[in-house]
Amino acid sequence: MKKLSGVLAGSLLLISASFSQDLKAHAELINTEGEVIGKAELIETNSGVLIKLNAKGLPPNAELAFHIHERGECKPPTFKSAKGHFNPYGKKHGLLNPEGPHAGDMPNIYTDDKGNVRVQVLNPFVTLKKGEKNSLFKEGGTALVIHSGPDDYKSDPAGNAGKRIACGVIR
């Protein structure tokens, strides 16, 4: 039993060491009507930024594009104020594009039959460390955006993902 407790304690120590407790952020997501529909917690890890997303009021049973956009501004109803995908290295769009991806490109998310999503996504291309080229805390900020359709992971500039239906400024 002592051996098991020691292994468990050591495992927990390793897991907690992979997260930087000082580097966290959050975003409150709104829909095109300006209503709060969810939240995201962002945590710096040794492998990138872990994004824990919890939202409701999205299209049911849908595959939706989920990106980080280059401006920390979410003006409904179009959210065009968030500008394009966060792309500090000037790459092409898409996780499947040999000349990509943008730092803000992430896997699609999936909603349940009620339009809810609860997911954790690790983005290895970004950081919460201020002053870094790929920092989400750059001048002008950044935002999380959910689109009305799936990202095809290759079409430039945005993966044919459809309209922007939710947005949250990363703080």
Swiss-Prot record:
Reaction(s) catalysed (UniProt annotation): 2 superoxide + 2 H(+) = H2O2 + O2
Keywords: Antioxidant, Copper, Disulfide bond, Metal-binding, Oxidoreductase, Signal, Zinc
One Pfam family linked to the record: Sod_Cu
Cystine connections: C74-C167
Cofactor: Cu cation; Zn(2+)
Domain of life: Bacteria
Note on how the cofactor is bound: Binds 1 copper ion per subunit. Binds 1 zinc ion per subunit.
PANTHER family on file: SUPEROXIDE DISMUTASE CU-ZN -RELATED (PTHR10003)
Record-given protein name: Superoxide dismutase [Cu-Zn] 2
Organism: Aquifex aeolicus (strain VF5)
